[in-house]
Every structure is written in C-alpha cells, then in structure tokens.
Amino acid sequence: MTTMDLNVSPLGRVEGDLDVRVTIEDGVVTSAWTEAAMFRGFEIILQGKDPQAGLIVTPRICGICGGSHLYKAAYALDTAWSTHVPPNATLVRNIAQACETLQSIPRYFYALFAIDLTNKNYAKSSMYEEAVRRFSAYVGTSYQPGVVLSGKPVEVYAIFGGQWPHSSFMVPGGVMCAPTLSDVTRSIAILEHWKVNWLEKYWLGTSVERWLDNKTWEDVLEWVDENEAQYNSDCGFFIRYCRDIGLDKYGQGPGNFLATGTYFQPELYTNPTIDGRNDALINRSGIYANGEFHTFDQARVTEDVTHSFYEGSTSRHPFEGETKPIDPKDGREQGKYSWAKSPRYDVPGTGYIPLEAGPLARRMAAGAPGAAAHQDYDPLFVDMVNKIGPSVFVRQMARMHEAAKYLKWARGWLDDLDLHESFYTKPVELTEGRGFGSTEAARGSLSDWIVIEDGKIANYQVVTPTAWNIGPRDSTGALGPIEQALVGSPIMDKDDPVELGHVARSFDSCLVCTVHAYDGKTGKELSKFVINGSV
C-alpha cells in the first residue's frame, strides 16, 4: 500500500485563505484537514457599536454576496426591534437577494468551476475537446457569454439599492427606495435579457418552464435526450460529461443538510419574529439528517472551537458566542488548526453533528413534505440524492437548477409591487433586545445573531455557509463537511490533484489562486499547477 500526505496551500480564497492537507492511500483520499488560514474578526469590530452598524459592516465581509449579508443583518434588527415591514419592502428585499444569487450562478460556474473540466487529466474522454471549446478560460464559447451576462441581474439590484456591491438600502422597517414604474419595467427587461440570452440560449437550450417540469432523476435523463437543443446545451453537455469523467462518483460529504431558508411571503412577515420565521418562508428552511426531515430551530445551533484558533474548547450558541483569538502557534500545540469555527446542529435523536449548507441543502429542504401553498415544493434533488447519492455533480446541478427557479420568482415579485403603497415604516429603536436574521446566500445558510444592551451591540455573531462547510473537526473528532467530502476522492495525478479542486468548488469555495503542491513528509514541491484555469 502506497501512502502519502499532500499539502495544498493555498487552495483558494473564501473570506481568507484555504489550506488543505490530505492523506492518500493507493490513489484515494483517506483523511483530510481544511484550514481557514486567515483571521476575520468582524464580530469584534461590531462590539460596542450602534445596532445599525451591522448594516454597514457585515456587507463588507464579502464582495460577491454583500447583499446577502445586508439582508440578514436587516432582519436581525427587525426581530430585535419588533419592526413593521410593509409588503412592498419584503418584495424588494426578495428581488434584490434573488438577483444577487442569479449573478453568482453563471459567474461561479464558468469562472470558478467549469474551467477545471478542461484539465488535461480528462484528455482521454471523447468529450474533452468539446469541454475545452466551451469552457476554456476567457476564450471558451460558453465562458465568455456566461461571465459577461452574469453581471446583468445585479443591475436590477442597483436600480433598487442604488449600487451593487455594498449597498445599505435595506434597513429595519423596510427599504430606502421608492421605485417608479420605469424602474420596474427596466428591471423586467434586464431579467428577460438574461433569461433569453444566457439561461435559455446557452444553459438550458429550452424554456425555463420546461426545465422546471423535471421532478425525478429519470426526468432529467429523458430531458437530455428529448431534442438536440437540450442535448447540446451547456446543461445537457455538463450532465453527459460529468457522468463520463466520474464527477457523480465522489465528493459525497456528510449526507446531512441544513437550510435556514430565504424569501418571505410579504403578508406573512409584516412583523418579523424569530418564532414566526419558518412559516413565512417561500424558499423553505429545514434539516435533512439520517434520512429524515426536521424543522429548523436556530436555538439548536452551536459553534465548537475545539480545533479552532480561539480560547477554550467549548461549544456555545451564537447568542452567547465568543470570538477570542489566540496565537496559532499556541493553538497548534493544543491540536487546533483553523481560524474557522465548527458550527454544529442538535438534530433530534442524534445530537450535535456537522451539516452541509448550500444549494443542495436548499433543494433537499424544498423536497420535504408539508409545504404550505406559498412555499416551494421541489422533489427533484431528494429523488436524485436517494437514487445516485450526493456528489460533486449533484451539488453543482443543484446550484444551476436555482437559476430557473429564482428567475421565475423574481419576475413574479416585480409584478406584485404596488407602487402606491409604502416601502418603509420607521421603527422604535429599542435599547435592549435579541435578534436573529438569516438568508440563503448563493453558497448557503448565512445568519446573524445580535444582542443589544444599553443601546449598543453587546454581542454579534455571524455564521457563514463557508463556516458550516469548511469548519474543522469538533470535540467528538467528527470531520467538517468538506473534509468528509474530500475523503474517498480518487487522485489520478498527485502532481495535479484537480479532484480536490472539484470537491472544494462544488461547495462554492471561490478558489481563484494558483496552487503549489508539497509532499507533506519531505516538504518537496511536487509541482506548481493550476486547478482553476488561471495563473
């Protein structure tokens, strides 16, 4: 048996550097460690500030999903201050949030994920030349329109929010805009342009409605072969190519999922509360663990720091959370190896376990029984996971599936706006309170917990989808979701382990750096290689 350790540093940049160490035995990853190698500390910055500081500070955590940070920060204050949010404001928040995610979908797919499909390791595939033609960085026939048109949806965000990224137009009690009929019609035209010129022309090769008719894995396979346009669309080609090169065979992860949900039915969330949140959601929250569905309850969330560079080794709920960094050198002596905390969820009957966040988690929650009339019920990915299991391929398909779904919703919300009604209700700024705000950013569940005392922020904790997915081992030794997903991955070429990139990117880890590989035992650089198509 041949055993080696492989260090990949940095593997990418998501709210800081990502380093990965894996043990490989006979060409298969048998253990993995993910290290968030950069300290953030936004929670520390917010302590002692005005409660509305979160509206300004948290969107700067991320340049690509700042709108998602603003969305959940606004709802955290809405629940803490018991505000009234007019239905129009909820619709605008929904539209803006959806448009930010819509821009992320093609940008992520072509610029961060699909270029790996041109890796020389796949040159023996009969479809390799076509993959190179479509997905090569900058010059690919699908890469160019996909990346260029990815910017269209956030033009809609800017119409309502004044700018994108880093807008601050969502505030407790509503939104700071008064859109006109011209604003709405421009927004409709922009989304139609994006749909016609990318989503239906390049990705689907058919209408949004036809794709959304697919409810089972068999439906998807039949859809591919239904006609030449669908067979040769980027979606049809991606399905065929992934199955040919084996991306449907690894990257499973824990198989347990968390979605906190997003988008509210306007008339059901005019007075936001923590307890009333789940019932008002359109894109549902939920837990899928050990083959069973459970209701999401924010009170069951904790953050473990046993293997994180923070004081102590206890788990705390975010309302009582602490962010007390220590010297990494001291931390390593205690067995700590990452700046990320380890979020865990107390699943009824199971206990605290790691859960995968992201598009696949959202799609699993959407497949749960019992959806109300206003809520999304979409059984496709529950069916796929049950029949072929989670994988790099299935995780990626879940992300792309949401392009059609969110576009349809955003278009409907634009029609629902009543331009003669209010978009804001001035709140009473309470000096004491606790609030919880959450959303589904493009890469998964994103949440804020705020504690207000004497009119100032006493505690502010942000739990990102990256933390859910990339967090290290916990006090029980349970691996984080990406660590689990890396285990079992085949490594064709130790000098160019593109498979590691596939797995990490299927969680949308935004990896954009050239990578060096080192033998973990000798320290010798094996090679300098590119796993995302750019140097």
Model regions and ranges:
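A translation/RNA-centric and nucleic-acid-associated enzymatic feature enriched
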Residues: D448-E453, Q461
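Catalytic-core signal marking the mid-to-C-terminal active-site face
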Residues: A458
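Active-site bordering "gate/hinge" segments
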Residues: M1-R443, D454, T464-V535
